[in-house]
Design a protein with these regions (language model features):
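N-terminal export leaders
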Residues: 2-7
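C-terminal motif of bacterial Sec signal peptides marking the signal peptidase cleavage site
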Residues: 16-17
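N-terminal segment immediately downstream of the Sec signal-peptide cleavage site
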Residues: 20-50
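Structured domain cores in non-transmembrane regions
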Residues: 38-155
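Glycine-rich, aromatic-bearing surface loops/beta-hairpins
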Residues: 149-235
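Hydrophobic helical h-region of N-terminal Sec-dependent signal peptides
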Residues: 8-12
């Protein structure tokens, strides 16, 4: 699989001549939980464009563009969780999640860099609501919350199965993808005003430069940046 950033840097021809077939999927991310047994849902509309790159120094490959923002999951007065458009695999850096997860959720077996005509047709013809699946794993996008939403340094990560540990009475149920034509959600910058002009990653906790741990040892709070709250097409 070839990363968009790598391909963009290697395409020496104009963008139009670098791209071949493409497909855009607009979808609603739906988070479901129960609060003292009562079901609740929150959602956010996002969009991914998949493109085949036909002229690059590496030959044929693929590119993606994700538009949208973190899902604001209000827990019926118990607090709020933000579901980021990235994942945090164990002992690793933050990485793309919906770009890969959409493919496996819809049953596309090929990777971003090797999509076929049939794969693009599957993406263009997608419909309905599906349980989110990232490969054959139970991994989900990263869930974060704040001790004080006005202070980004109070961010912390929450394993989805442990929601009730942080918000008593709340149990996470599922994350679904529903194909839609609704407008993209744009609520996050109003909810977290410090994101409007935040370009400095140091608004979040950071190790001192002289003693910085490797990414494999860092908690999410110490590697996240403001851009990670948005897809690369919405930053």
């Amino acid at each position: 699989m070839k990363r968009r950033s790598l391909l963009a840097s290697l395409c020496v021809l104009p963008l139009a001549s670098c791209q071949g077939e493409s497909a855009t999927v607009r979808f609603k991310v739906i988070a479901s939980a129960t609060v003292n047994g009562r079901p609740i849902e929150s959602s956010s509309v996002m969009e991914i464009t998949y493109s085949k790159v036909t002229h690059s120094l590496l030959g044929t490959g693929g590119a993606t563009r994700l538009c949208g923002e973190a899902l604001i999951f209000d827990l019926d007065g118990r607090g709020t969780v933000y579901i980021l458009p990235v994942q945090h695999p164990p002992e690793s850096s933050l990485s793309q999640v919906y770009e890969y997860g959409m493919l496996t959720t819809l049953g596309v077996k090929n990777g971003i860099g090797s999509l076929t005509e049939q794969d693009f047709a599957t993406l263009r013809g997608a419909n309905g609501r599906h349980s989110f699946r990232l490969y054959g794993t139970a991994r989900l996008p990263s869930f974060v919350a704040f001790n004080d939403e006005r202070d980004p340094k109070t961010i912390f990560e929450i394993p989805p199965p442990e929601l009730d540990r942080y918000f008593p009475g709340v149990r996470f149920k599922s994350l679904d993808i529903q194909i839609t034509n609704e407008p993209l959600t744009e609520k996050l910058r109003e909810r977290l005003p410090w994101l409007k002009n935040a370009n400095d990653p140091n608004i979040f906790p950071r190790d001192p430069r002289a003693t910085r741990r490797p990414n494999s040892e860092l908690p999410l709070s110490h590697m996240i940046t403001p851009a990670r709250f948005f897809g690369d097409g919405s930053r």
